[in-house]
Amino acid sequence: MRVQDVYNVIYTHTEGEPLCIIYSGVPYPAGSTILEKRAFLEENYDWLRKALMREPRGHADMFGVFLTPPSSRDYDAGLIYIDGKEYSHMCGHGTIAVAMAMVANGLVARDPSGLTRIRFETTAGLVVAEVAHEGDRVLWTRFENVPAYVAAQDIAFELPGYGPLKADLVWGGNYFGIIDLRGTSLRIAPENGSELSRMGLIAREEIRKKVKVQHPTEAHINNLNFVTFWHEPTIEGCLYKNVHVFSAGQLDRSPGGTGTSAMMAYFEARGVIGLNQPITSEGLLGSGTFEGCLIGETTLGTVRAVRPTVKGTAGMLGTASWTINREDPVDAGFLVL
């Protein structure tokens, strides 16, 4: 055992979905863009991602974010999202949580009005959050996400045991393959987690075979990582219940922030909802909701897109100062799949 560098983190959850916020210990190159910062992490600090996301400090479903300095005065901070397997372009449950944590822990100056605005730089684009607070209480976050759009509809594929289905490919900060489970026997519930995970990975591979993924304006965004299953809600007043399957088969416990953005674009394209029509989304656990709204139209290059906002709340779980022995293969992080 020897003295190691120390990395300070904050732990939160958003409707059950965890977040490890890594806010110290990484010497990002001065003046670097968010893409350059991610490349720097991938080349020099990917071991830190693995050590904090994986066992013994994390677990198979841990999610995290590197909270970085801004690259210019146009932003207040940068967000680089991670899990035990890879990096994500954006994360809504994470944005809700990190914005509230920044206000609660003094990482950003509070606006005297009780509504603090934070401009985040992500690898998906600009995300603007507003955090409500009153006295020593931090109440909620609402953020305007990057523009969302439907890239493809009615992608036919076969899901073993559940017959022929169709998926829509939708961008909402990440690309999602959205699949309607109504009419099948597969239900979205924690007790069906293993089956949902297995079917999500199969569906993702089938969709990847059928469509080429490429963002209209961001050349670096060309991957499908998320599959969303949805059916009727179990909470009164919700438009739907869904679960997002991603990376190595992890299940988002929350309704999903980028997922709610994609789902609103999906429903708007099919005429189910309109602009400026608030909706409520239900997640895997059936115990909490997000509020969403499409506040307008825009374009991504020549592609029509919509402007999603998502509102939710997160809870503080604790803080930690981690030391990591990179010479110990167990201490450096491992996964049991």
UniProtKB/Swiss-Prot annotation:
- Residues annotated as binding substrate are G92, H93, D252, G257, T258
Q: Which InterPro entries match?
A: Pro_racemase_fam
Swiss-Prot/TrEMBL catalytic activity: trans-4-hydroxy-L-proline = cis-4-hydroxy-D-proline
Q: Which domain of life is it from?
A: Bacteria
- The residues annotated as the active site are C91 (proton acceptor)
Q: What class of enzyme is it?
A: isomerase
Its keywords, alphabetically, are: Isomerase
Its induction note reads: Is up-regulated when the bacterium is grown on t4LHyp as sole carbon source.
List the effects observed when the gene is inactivated: Cells lacking this gene loss their ability to grow on t4LHyp as a sole carbon source.
The GO terms this record gives for MF are: 4-hydroxyproline epimerase activity
What EC number is given for this enzyme?
A: 5.1.1.8
Q: Which SUPFAM superfamilies match?
A: Diaminopimelate epimerase-like (SSF54506)
Q: What task does this protein carry out?
A: Catalyzes the epimerization of trans-4-hydroxy-L-proline (t4LHyp) to cis-4-hydroxy-D-proline (c4DHyp). Is involved in a degradation pathway that converts t4LHyp to alpha-ketoglutarate, which allows R.sphaeroides to grow on t4LHyp as a sole carbon source. Displays no proline racemase activity.
Membership in a protein family: Belongs to the proline racemase family.
PANTHER family per the UniProt record, alphabetical: BIFUNCTIONAL TRANS-3-HYDROXY-L-PROLINE DEHYDRATASE_2-EPIMERASE, TRANS-3-HYDROXY-L-PROLINE DEHYDRATASE
Tell me what this protein is called.
4-hydroxyproline 2-epimerase
Q: Which organism is it from?
A: Cereibacter sphaeroides (strain ATCC 17023 / DSM 158 / JCM 6121 / CCUG 31486 / LMG 2827 / NBRC 12203 / NCIMB 8253 / ATH 2.4.1.) (Rhodobacter sphaeroides)
